[in-house]
Amino acid sequence: MRLSGRDLRCVRGGREVFAGLAFEASGGEALALVGHNGAGKTSLLRLIAGLLTPEAGTITLDGGEPDTPVAEQAHYLGHRDALKPSLSVGENLGFWRDFLGGERTDLSAGIKAVGLGHAAELPAAYLSAGQRRRLSIARLLVVRRPIWLLDEPTSALDVKGQELFVGLMQEHLARGGIIVAATHTPLGIPVREQRIGAAT
């Protein structure tokens, strides 16, 4: 499996963020996007996720589902946790599982995998910032998709939470998955760097 972008141009708010950008990541590989603030790291993740449309260029996934858009074969974990405060941990995760569709796994397994088994019935409003982040990470587990797009994924996680997430990323890569991440802190796994924008 290979995820690639060719001659990508991104414009936001009338400003060109980048042009002529190319990238490539193979199954089992983590690609870390590096560059100064505003260089377009988050914009590239959002292009791959289908949340933005490129002004030019193409994004393809060789070895994926041929009739399924790349965006529907990717998970995007952004800055915000996108949780409904009044819903429980289990209900929030169930909502995302049903919304995302595809091949599904057991909710309880996903909740336990991120260390929230004791809080499955607790409303999200009562979770700490780190627990909310763990619940967002659980979305990656209950619907299997080969591409993980991660924007500052370890924000709000304590050391134990970061170690847990490292294990989940390692398992995803071992299954042949792809990770593309924008982060200011090390992911804790081997990565290949992709510079976005001019070197600083």
UniProtKB/Swiss-Prot annotation:
GO molecular function list: ABC-type heme transporter activity; ATP binding; ATP hydrolysis activity
EC main group: translocase
Membrane topology, from the record: Peripheral membrane protein
UniProt KW Cell membrane keyword: yes
Gene Ontology annotations for the cellular component aspect, listed alphabetically: plasma membrane
InterPro entries in UniProt: AAA+_ATPase, ABC_transporter-like_ATP-bd, ABC_transporter-like_CS, ABC_transptr_haem_export_CcmA, P-loop_NTPase
Catalytic function, reaction form: heme b(in) + ATP + H2O = heme b(out) + ADP + phosphate + H(+)
Purpose of the protein: Part of the ABC transporter complex CcmAB involved in the biogenesis of c-type cytochromes; once thought to export heme, this seems not to be the case, but its exact role is uncertain. Responsible for energy coupling to the transport system.
Name the record gives this protein: Cytochrome c biogenesis ATP-binding export protein CcmA
Organism encoding this protein: Rhodopseudomonas palustris (strain ATCC BAA-98 / CGA009)
